[in-house]
């Protein structure tokens, strides 16, 4: 990314892709934003809608395009994918979305793209790992949203439980984006004070908070059909950190190289993000039990990936 032009390509203009585009145009100075989707009419409508947003914010060339448009992009964001069907196994979902991913990643790489991939398609940790495998890119140039959304939900749950502002909560969810995620209770701070000095952190408290975090997505889906605003902002923050060379500490699906005793897989962890992508993984302190749980899921994840690939 030595050039001055700032260009992002979004693949997938569904609810997440569209919401992300809106957040990106609001919050990042771009020269060019390209939307790639099979349903071109919808993408063209989004372009027209986003042009009006750009008139209030930043001068941006927004248009629909093809995978070939990625050749000079800084970032390709992949939000495309299919949701899990009733009764469908996790492996079946992985197989379906891996095929979709392959149909995207190969032509993007063939275009000459030399930037960073950012992934939000689910299951995000596995599909981020698969993107790196399919692309052959260095691990630091492939990043997923990981447990960033889980972390946001944790902050909201704690803020509501303790009657404080979300900005007063410093907390993280690690590992898998999903039911195997790990709430790092020992490291939570409320107004710069350890959580255990603010309230009683017993098994009941932990269970209530974990349920609030893991159950929120299902609640939203049952009420409005899908979740998309939170992950859209997560994507925006990652892209902004890359475009602005922020060296920002974010929770992402990061390539692990020995951290937490795990190698060659992507899982949720704090990391430093800058113009080169993932600059550094910050290994959070975990108890022996939490570390074992994370390693157990990593082993399952590797098995599923090897079967699917």
From Swiss-Prot:
Its main location: cytoplasm. InterPro entries: L-lactate/malate_DH (IPR001557), L-lactate_DH (IPR011304), L-lactate_DH_AS (IPR018177), Lactate/malate_DH_C (IPR022383), Lactate/malate_DH_N (IPR001236), Lactate_DH/Glyco_Ohase_4_C (IPR015955), NAD(P)-bd_dom_sf (IPR036291). Keywords: Cytoplasm, NAD, Oxidoreductase. Pathway: Fermentation; pyruvate fermentation to lactate; (S)-lactate from pyruvate: step 1/1. GO terms for molecular function: L-lactate dehydrogenase activity. It is found in: Cytoplasm. Its EC number is 1.1.1.27. NAD(+) binds at residues 16, 37, 67, 81-82, 103, 145. The keyword Lyase does not apply. Disulfide bonds: none annotated. The keyword Transmembrane helix does not apply. GO terms for cellular component: cytoplasm. The active site is at 177 (proton acceptor). One of its GO terms (biological process) is lactate metabolic process. PROSITE patterns: L_LDH. Belongs to the LDH/MDH superfamily. LDH family. Catalyzes the conversion of lactate to pyruvate. This is L-lactate dehydrogenase 2. It comes from Lactiplantibacillus plantarum (strain ATCC BAA-793 / NCIMB 8826 / WCFS1).
């Amino acid at each position: 990314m030595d050039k001055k032009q700032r260009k992002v390509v979004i693949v997938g203009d569904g609810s997440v892709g569209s919401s992300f585009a809106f957040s990106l145009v609001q919050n990042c100075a771009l020269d060019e934003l390209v939307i790639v989707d099979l349903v071109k009419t919808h993408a063209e409508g989004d372009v027209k809608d986003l042009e009006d947003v750009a008139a209030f914010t930043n001068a941006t060339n927004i248009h629909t395009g093809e995978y070939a448009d990625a050749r000079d992009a800084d970032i390709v964001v992949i939000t495309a994918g299919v949701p899990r069907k009733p009764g469908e196994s996790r492996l079946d979902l992985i197989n379906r979305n891996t095929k979709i991913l392959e149909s995207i990643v190969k032509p993007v790489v063939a275009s000459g793209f030399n930037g960073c991939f950012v992934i939000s398609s689910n299951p995000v940790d596995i599909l981020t790992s698969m993107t790196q495998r399919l692309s052959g890119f260095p691990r630091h140039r492939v990043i997923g949203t990981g447990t960033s959304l889980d972390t946001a939900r944790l902050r909201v749950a704690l803020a509501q439980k303790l009657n404080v502002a979300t900005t007063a909560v410093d907390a993280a969810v690690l590992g898998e984006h999903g039911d195997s995620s790990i709430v790092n209770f020992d490291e939570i701070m409320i107004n710069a004070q350890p959580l255990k000095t603010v309230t009683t952190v017993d098994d009941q408290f932990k269970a209530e908070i974990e349920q609030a975090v893991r159950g929120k997505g299902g609640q939203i889906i049952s009420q409005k059909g899908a979740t998309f605003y939170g992950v859209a902002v997560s994507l925006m923050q990652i892209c902004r950190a890359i475009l602005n060379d922020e060296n920002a500490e974010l929770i992402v699906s990061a390539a692990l190289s020995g951290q937490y005793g795990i190698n060659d897989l992507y899982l949720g962890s704090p990391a430093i993000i800058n113009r080169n992508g993932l600059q550094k993984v910050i290994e959070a302190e975990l108890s022996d039990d939490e570390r074992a749980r994370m390693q157990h899921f990593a082993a399952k994840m590797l098995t599923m990936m090897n079967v699917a690939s």
